[in-house]
């Protein structure tokens, strides 16, 4: 028997699709429903390695944990990992299949993947009672409707009802709900069952007249109003859509266990990947994690982390341009703690030979670790288990770089010299005993009277956060009505909201016979890079995309119709 399902779409990127999907999964599994998450196509630099060695989006791994099932490649068959302004690495069924430009991806290749993603969805439906799908960006991107495989494309194929999530904290949620619906075709509108308001602050009764008017305009009900929830700490889907400059993560669990706090600075390098590595540190009472992009911000840090990146050579150049490279070398010489993870580990080495990622050839590293890196075309995808500092450690590896360690003390797969550590392993800090031992060493080297809490369990904290998501759905949504959608599909007779989607090819470059722009404004997963305002666009990570007044003027001259203005 095929299981039921639901597509969680959003009015915009960051509307809350990932956490709502996770919350529904946790709510369902607590009701005894065997449920799985699914996202046909994801654009993310935060990824995860499954037990079978497949790379998928980190958000889908988190949703699988919410559903209490083991994540597999079926749950995220297509993953796009941006590596430059106009290209992404395409990961299909957990394995990289090559780099592709945005133009090439839109030129028929994306449509060709529809069969693959629907096959994966059908396999999940044959195994689970319910599959909760997450969309990408907005389903109303009219310029991308023809090639859509992640929003209404997958909903049509599966005949799944669609729940549209809107972030009211941004403002304009009613216009967003109405406009999203009104820009869909009649066929697609017949699947849009209704709406879910996310991140509401205040008295819900003040919102109810607007919800009634929305029903009058669209003929669709609102299935819930989720309150703004602080301190969830759930995995970010990717690091492209937001500048992390100045962002702070710290424990909301308890005050410091010792006399001092421990200050951690994370270099917000370009194309930062798996920055969720620091979440386990931020969960420790007394540890404050800050993302930085200026050399002076390293001065008072007790530990500096150079995180993973999809562009190691680009990150190295960025560190040098910012003066951060010199500051890191100086820290190492002074015996002040530095940790390099994956691409950050590679940066700390002596030399990088890269004919794969950047094709820059041989580039000098910072030289603080006795390591030489050679990029291989085959990607390492692994779930290693080992020990370090006398404690057991588990992690996962996602990298093209092969490390030739030529000295220092062994540290996981990498090495340690003084107070500088380097490893390719992501997720190692989630191993509680190892994390406590590592933080104690950092505190000693930094001269801090910081004591790791003896009972902090990152796994337990994560389960508590997922339960909070399940509680939000159970307490603030019409749970019975949601289950009715999952089992029975969208209500019959939903009215059409004009004007509907324009005919394919109406207006724009396509109807004029010209090639479409290679990087149109679009939701996540459908472009490699473009203008800011939608996930995967702008590539501003940690302040790496700077705009001077002169630069803004040049952009305006090139992209604005000056005569019309």
Q: Can you say where each PLM-predicted feature lies in the sequence?
A:
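Short, low-complexity intrinsically disordered segments enriched in A/P/G/S/L with frequent Arg
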Residues: 506, 518-519, 529, 542, ...
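Extracellular/periplasmic helix-exit of transmembrane alpha-helices
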Residues: 349-356
């Amino acid at each position: 028997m095929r299981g039921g399902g639901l597509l969680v779409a959003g009015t915009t990127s960051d509307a809350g699709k990932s956490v709502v999907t996770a919350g529904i999964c946790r709510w369902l599994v607590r009701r005894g429903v065997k449920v799985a998450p699914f996202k046909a196509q994801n654009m993310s630099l935060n990824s995860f390695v499954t037990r079978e060695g497949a790379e998928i989006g980190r958000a889908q791994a988190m949703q699988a944990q919410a559903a209490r099932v083991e994540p597999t490649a079926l749950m995220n068959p297509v993953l796009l990992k941006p590596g430059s302004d106009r290209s992404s690495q395409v990961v299909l069924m957990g394995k990289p299949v090559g780099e592709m430009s945005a133009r090439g991806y839109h030129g028929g290749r994306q449509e060709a993947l529809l069969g693959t993603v629907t096959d994966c969805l059908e396999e999940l439906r044959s195994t689970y009672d319910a599959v909760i799908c997450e969309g990408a960006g907005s389903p109303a991107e009219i310029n991308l409707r023809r090639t859509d495989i992640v929003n209404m494309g997958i909903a049509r194929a599966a005949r799944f009802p669609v729940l549209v999530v809107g972030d009211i904290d941004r403002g304009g949620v009613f216009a967003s709900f109405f406009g999203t619906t009104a820009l869909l075709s009649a066929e697609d509108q017949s699947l849009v069952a209704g709406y879910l308001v996310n991140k509401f602050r205040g008295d819900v009764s003040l919102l109810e007249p607007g919800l009634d008017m929305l029903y009058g305009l669209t003929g669709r009900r609102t299935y819930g109003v989720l309150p703004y929830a602080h301190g969830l700490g759930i995995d970010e889907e990717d690091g492209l859509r937001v500048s992390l400059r100045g962002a702070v993560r710290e424990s909301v669990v308890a005050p410091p266990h010792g006399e001092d706090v421990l200050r951690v600075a994370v270099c917000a390098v370009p194309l930062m990947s798996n920055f969720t590595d620091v979440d386990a540190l931020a969960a420790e009472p007394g540890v404050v994690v800050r993302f930085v992009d200026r050399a002076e911000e390293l001065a008072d840090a007790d530990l500096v982390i150079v995180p993973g990146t999809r562009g190691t050579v680009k990150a190295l150049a960025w560190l040098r341009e910012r003066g951060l490279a010199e500051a890191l070398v100086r820290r190492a010489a002074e015996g002040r703690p530095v940790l390099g993870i994956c691409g950050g580990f590679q940066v700390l080495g002596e030399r990088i030979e890269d004919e794969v990622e950047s094709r820059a050839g041989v580039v000098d590293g910072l030289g603080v670790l006795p390591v030489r890196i050679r990029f291989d075309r085959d990607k390492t995808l692994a779930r290693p288990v080992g020990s370090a500092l006398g404690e057991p450690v588990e992690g996962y590896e996602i990298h093209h770089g092969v490390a030739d360690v030529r000295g220092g003390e062994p540290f996981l797969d990498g090495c340690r010299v003084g107070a500088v550590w380097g490893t390719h392993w992501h997720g190692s800090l989630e191993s509680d005993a190892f994390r406590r031992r590592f933080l104690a060493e950092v505190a000693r080297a930094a001269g801090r009277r910081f004591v790791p809490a003896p009972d902090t369990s990152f796994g337990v904290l994560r389960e508590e956060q997922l339960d909070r998501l399940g509680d939000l759905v159970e307490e603030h949504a019409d749970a019975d009505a949601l289950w009715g959608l999952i089992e029975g599909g969208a209500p019959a007779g939903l009215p059409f909201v004009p004007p509907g989607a324009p005919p394919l090819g109406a207006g724009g470059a396509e109807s004029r016979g010209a090639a479409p722009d290679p990087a149109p404004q679009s939701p996540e997963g459908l472009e490699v890079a473009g203008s800011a305002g939608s996930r995967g666009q702008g590539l501003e990570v940690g302040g790496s995309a700077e705009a001077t007044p002169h630069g803004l003027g040049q952009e305006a001259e090139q992209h604005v119709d000056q005569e019309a203005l």
